[in-house]
Design a protein with these regions (language model features):
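Alpha/beta catalytic cores of nucleotide-metabolism and tRNA/nucleoside-modifying enzymes
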Residues: 1-25, 105-106, 167, 227, ...
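Bateman/CBS regulatory modules and CBS-like beta-alpha motifs in cytosolic regions of diverse proteins
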Residues: 29-45, 52-54, 83-121, 128-130, ...
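Active-site-adjacent beta->alpha loops and helix N-cap segments on the catalytic face
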Residues: 31, 80-89, 147-151, 171, ...
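Short beta-strand/loop segments at the ligand-binding rim of alpha/beta enzyme cores
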Residues: 44-51, 97-102, 161, 217-227, ...
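Catalytic cores of alpha/beta
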Residues: 61-64, 236-244, 277, 283-301, ...
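Glycine-rich phosphate-binding active-site loops on the catalytic face of alpha/beta enzymes
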Residues: 68-83, 246-258, 297-315, 345-379
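Catalytic beta/alpha-barrel core
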Residues: 74-78, 104-105, 125-127, 165-167, ...
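Short beta->alpha transition motifs characteristic of CBS
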Residues: 75-80, 123, 127, 135-150, ...
């Protein structure tokens, strides 16, 4: 006699509230643990946090902030190709050892044009060059601050006499001395024929000292990734993003174990063999292995665990997140390809569990959607400050460009869309730096309890399955909270 349980139920699935990590003998202090990990095959992170490619989570401000903390942000795709490329370029220009392709203005341009460029790129000075890229001067906001005639030629207001420059082999320490001695903030770098080849700024040197753990490329620029879908213009979008300096491309779909996603992955690796391609989302080891066999440099894991996702309810499909992470981690063992645990994280303890189950990094959305740097609208409700937060499968996000993520790109009539997410609001939390500090602190603490000095060590930690009573016991109980902690609020 056939049995539904025996024939069709293949496994039990567990998620964060179903388990706890078992404390182990430890010689590890939380403050000394090593958090360096891999985002993708060729990109390292100094902390295992990735901000989600969502239109209420990651644009340039968020990507800059998380990279400065040591993680990486994925710029969402709900915008034009040109705008997404511009967002990437802003991140790549935000911080540099030396700016290898500085924004310049041509001799003969106007003060108004210089001011527009400064506003667009958020910079305080621009080298002035001739048609052959010879450096002829530099114009800064100090030169323009009291200039009322915006039609005036920049040649008349720029600094050109006794212009301080340096050569390409100057290191940052020597550059800092030159800037200090001459009381200037920007140091143009020129070759033997006075062609402009770069720019070193005092602000960048200061930032490098203030944020030594920042996630940077080999040129000292902040790292950033960008999301794409599976559409007719995917390769065009990728080309623009790569040209803008994107360090990795994330092919972001609701179902990565799909013929169309794999075909796009193969095309992408053929067109951009030197760019890391991250692909998701999946929930099984078989899916992850297929993506890796076709060239994926990292795999994103999570079908339906997010706080704003309704896929499991609408489609009846998914996998409890911890089981999904473990299944994928087991399948990818020995491949050198890391996995990103995406979704379902409510507390720093969930981050520890996701990494212990096999994750190399975690993708966070709701945990940072309430920060100052998120692009969500600020809302005042009942005297409290909130920020808007929505799933990319929500009706509102799908109308703005994320239909292809759910394989509904051809649906023109809004009433015919089938959403797999909702829109809402989350409490305002302050700056990203404050939130990441608490998340990193919780992760360090968890690693200390497990005796894990590295995230790789944490992969060997043991779990205990708990009951609902165990969950209740884990939270504060039998008390009225009178003073909230910065890293805990009661589950709603």
């Amino acid at each position: 006699m056939s049995s539904f349980v025996a024939d069709r139920i293949v496994m039990d699935g567990l998620t964060f509230d179903d388990v706890l990590l078992i404390p182990a003998y430890s010689e590890v202090l939380p403050r000394t643990v090593e958090l360096k990990t891999k985002f993708s095959r060729n990109i390292d992170l100094n902390i295992p946090f990735v901000t989600a490619a969502m239109d209420t989570v990651t644009e340039s401000a968020m990507a800059i902030a998380i990279a400065r903390e040591g993680g990486i942000g994925v710029i969402h795709k709900n915008m034009s190709i040109e705008e997404q490329a511009r967002q990437v370029a802003i991140v790549k220009r935000a911080e540099n050892g030396m700016i290898y392709d500085p924004v310049t203005i041509r001799r003969g341009s106007t003060v108004g044009e210089a001011l527009d460029m400064m506003a667009e790129y958020h910079i305080g000075g621009i080298p002035v060059v001739d048609d052959d890229n010879h450096l002829v001067g530099i114009v800064t906001n100090r030169d323009l601050r009291f200039e009322l005639n915006h039609d005036r030629n920049v040649d008349e207001v720029m600094t050109s006499e006794n212009l301080v420059t340096t050569h390409i082999k100057t290191d940052l320490a020597a550059a800092a001395n030159i800037l200090q001695e001459n009381k200037i903030e920007k140091l143009p770098v020129v070759d033997s024929e006075n062609h402009l080849v770069g720019l070193i700024t005092y602000k960048d040197i200061t930032k490098a000292k203030d944020k030594p753990m920042a996630c940077k490329d080999d040129k000292g620029r902040l790292r950033v990734a960008a999301g794409v879908g599976v559409t007719a213009d995917t390769l065009d979008r990728m080309q623009a993003l790569v040209n803008a300096g994107a360090d990795a491309i994330v092919i972001d779909t609701a179902h990565g174990h799909s013929k169309y996603v794999i075909e796009k992955l193969v095309e992408a690796k053929k067109s951009f063999p030197n760019v890391d391609i991250v692909v998701g989302n999946v929930a099984t080891g078989a899916a992850a292995k297929m993506l890796v066999d076709n060239g994926a440099d990292a795999v994103k894991v999570g079908i339906g665990p997010g706080s704003i996702c309704t896929t499991r309810v609408v489609a009846g499909v998914g996998m409890p997140q911890l089981s999904a992470v473990y299944d994928v981690a087991s399948a990818l063992e020995g491949t050198g390809v890391p996995l990103i645990a995406d979704g379902g994280l409510r507390y720093s303890g969930d981050v520890v569990k996701a990494l212990a189950a096999g994750g190399y990094s975690v993708m966070i959305g709701s945990l940072v959607a309430g920060t100052e740097e998120s692009p969500g609208d600020t809302i005042i409700f009942n005297g409290r400050k909130f920020k808007s937060y929505r799933g990319m499968g929500s009706l509102e996000a799908m109308e703005n460009g994320s239909k292809d993520r759910y394989f509904q790109a051809g649906t023109k009539d809004v009433k015919k869309l089938v959403p797999e997410g909702i829109a809402g609001r989350v409490p305002y939390k302050g700056t990203l730096q404050e939130v990441i500090y608490q998340l990193v602190g919780g992760l360090r603490s968890g690693m200390g309890y497990c005796g894990a000095n590295t995230i790789s060590d944490l992969h060997s930690a043991k779990f205990v399955r708990i009951t609902n009573a165990g969950v209740l016991e884990s939270h504060p109980h039998d008390i009225s909270i009178t003073s909230e902690a910065p890293n805990y609020s009661r589950p709603e």
